[in-house]
Amino acid sequence: MIKTNWEGNCFLNFFNNKSSLENVDKTIFKSKSTSPYKLLKSTHDQEGRCILPVLHTAGGLVGGDLLEFEVNLEKNSKVLLTTSSAQKVYGSVGISKVNPKGTFSKQNNLIKILDNSHLEYLPQETIIFANGLYEQKFKVFISETSSFLFTDLIRLGRSSSGESIESGVFRSKLEIVRNNDLYDDWEYVDQIELSKASYVAKSGMDYMPVFGSLIWICEKDFSKSNINNLVGNIKKIFNETENNLSIGILENGISVRFLGSSSQDARKCFFCIWKQIRSVCGFCEPKYQGVWPLQDPMNY
């Protein structure tokens, strides 16, 4: 029997290149991957941060596809990880008597961030086409002296074509664990399921097709006043009601939710918040990446 589904994997190991001839140490990486993953050319910013776009060459996912994505940051690494295109999840295949509604496509993500390392994982949006079934899981282990920034942008259906999610489902589970010398401490857990029911519910998405999350977990000893100032600055820039934003302060970081009708508006909001996070951390100002949509004017 010929297999028709993808089973791809990608392993990325980042480490600080102390032998760099320049004044700033650069983060470099080693990788191992199979189709449909493809790594595009990496670059570096002025702080030696490795900027790596990842491409999914298959053009999308269907039921039964399984992707394994593993990222490891060695000590003193700085990484910006993104994707070169939106992830598309098509209507499920594999419908049978056993699975009358079809089969989920799945992606499992394992991330380990060692001491004094900083990962920004900013993939482009995931589009759930009509009847698409998708499940993603993230398990993140982070040291007490490291940070993790993650954005997750979901569009249910192609509203420009009058398409909704129909019987499709999006599931996501994010677990962030803080490592220390004595024990592992749960830092953040988030579990989401989006479907037609949540899309139409007045207390849910209320027919807003775009849902986004931004999670920033900072170093354990990061100043609480700086976190409060960060949230204050974000609220000064955005009217939370008008921009469909909800901002919360975590024990060590912030959580932001976006709900609206425009992926472009969500990207603009998250880019602005990213700039504010970079500023409060004392890092260089981020630049709009060349693999991202060109029509987005980032004028905040």
Curated annotation (Swiss-Prot):
<comment type="subunit">
    <text>UreD, UreF and UreG form a complex that acts as a GTP-hydrolysis-dependent molecular chaperone, activating the urease apoprotein by helping to assemble the nickel containing metallocenter of UreC. The UreE protein probably delivers the nickel.</text>
</comment>
<dbReference type="InterPro" id="IPR002669">
    <property type="entry name" value="UreD"/>
</dbReference>
<dbReference type="GO" id="GO:0005737">
    <property type="term" value="C:cytoplasm"/>
</dbReference>
<keyword id="KW-0963">Cytoplasm</keyword>
<dbReference type="GO" id="GO:0016151">
    <property type="term" value="F:nickel cation binding"/>
</dbReference>
<dbReference type="Pfam" id="PF01774">
    <property type="entry name" value="UreD"/>
</dbReference>
<comment type="function">
    <text>Required for maturation of urease via the functional incorporation of the urease nickel metallocenter.</text>
</comment>
<comment type="similarity">
    <text>Belongs to the UreD family.</text>
</comment>
<keyword id="KW-0143">Chaperone</keyword>
<keyword id="KW-0996">Nickel insertion</keyword>
<protein>
    <recommendedName>
        <fullName>Urease accessory protein UreD</fullName>
    </recommendedName>
</protein>
